[in-house]
Amino acid sequence: MAMPKLEVPLLFLFFFFFFLALTPSRAQTFGPPLVSPIQKDASTLQYIVTAYLQSQPQETKLLLDLGASYIWINCDDYNSSSYRHIPCTTLLDEYVGCFACLMNCRDSNPNCGDSVCVLKPENPFQPSFSGNEQYAPALVDYFSMLTVDNTGSIGGPSSSSPFTFIFSCGYKENLEGLARGVTGSAGLGRSSISIPVQASAIYHYPRYFALCLSGSKTRPGAAFVGTKGPYKFGRRIDLSKPLAYTPLLLNPVGKYSYPDLKKPSSEYFIGVTSIKVNGKAVALNQSLLAIDSGNGSGGTKLSTVVPYTQLETSIYKAVTEAFVKAAASSPFNLTTTKPVQPFSVCYPASNVRSTRAGPTMPAIDLVMHRNDVVWKILGSNSMVRVAEKGGADVWCLGFVDAGVRPKTSVFAGDPSIVIGGHQMEDNFLQFDLESMRLGFSSSVLSRGTSCASFRFAAKTG
């Protein structure tokens, strides 16, 4: 079914967003919250969500980028009759935070316009500040996802009342490094035009989203937007209960900062204050665990585009040494073997016992803002199975050395810890953007369920 032509004046659209964002009452919502399967691409280890875009909704695969500011899509192949550009020097231009203004491009296509706002397609697998950055027009167009009700029933993307979303165009060359079939990115970060914030503004959804990345090679996990729960997984277990909570911290220096202009990061940080291995605290340089307000370095970031947790060199050395020592002691009694890249600590698989929570290994505890708030990393998340055909079959500690304060941009420093996708798998994460806190479960495998157990039944509607 073709969508009606988008005729909403852009200035009105801005005030519509602004009014809804400031409305205190959220009792009335418009339609059920959003849900998407999260597929893991085996070759790139990237996580992929599904959305529906354009005037005649097309299923679109997007990279799940937890820290990105907004959606972007390859517009070289974008065929929609309903899109609109955002004019420069308007209130909406300021609200969106456009990078610049595109002038004198008069071809009739989404990637071209005269005096229109442009954004930067954010591809985390292409280097930033390379001197060859591309910008592309911002668009307003239809965007939808699957929906889910409180019983867990799945509905199809609505053709009668789709979302009107702001996002960025991109070009084919911006897809370099992305998984096959992916045509853009789904940004969930701290931004006025991220998916959860736009969905909340338009439809009065609570400013919540949740991720449950699957540890299965074949079955997807699930992403939820606009609901506090319940989140019904296998055996009808609601993963919103119980959760531990820790504040989401703002890094005041984002990757697009300059010496004379600091822009806050769109990425999510949490306050890890110590690390324990097998119940014993690891000696760390505490200054590395805090965010430096001057250059944004340090602290702990969450990332869905990093496959394995990255630790600053001194932290990595301390944690791995403590882990090897604990694994060598009773009741584990394990001896390391030749490592397999990119890991440095591995054990013969034949010597490792397994439970439903994964291989039996020393627990790694990330202690948050209070000593009783702990993200416990068990064997299913601390270890990675590497079985080479005709070669090694080992369990490896799934953490990597990030170097000594590496830089991702010219002016902003890197975090000391980046919690990667593998460590999040089969952990339920709820992002409460109203109270700016993270709810987390630790591994749900110990509860007899998994992130792959959410049922994406036949679509309706």
Residue ranges with predicted function:
Residues 3-8, 20, 24, 43-46, ...:
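Aspartic protease catalytic domain
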Residues 9-14:
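Sec-dependent N-terminal signal peptides
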Residues 16-33:
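N-terminal signal peptide
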Residues 30-35, 117-128, 194, 255-257, ...:
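Short Pro/Gly-enriched beta-strand edge/turn motifs at strand-loop
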Residues 42-181:
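Signature of the N-terminal lobe/flap region of pepsin-like aspartyl proteases
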Residues 79-103, 236-246, 318-340:
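Cytochrome P450 catalytic domain signature, combining two hallmark sequence patches
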Residues 87-88, 199-200, 454-459:
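Extended Gly/Ser/Thr-rich low-complexity repeat segments
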Residues 128-137, 141-267, 301, 366, ...:
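Glycine-rich flap/beta-hairpin and adjacent strands of clan AA aspartyl proteases
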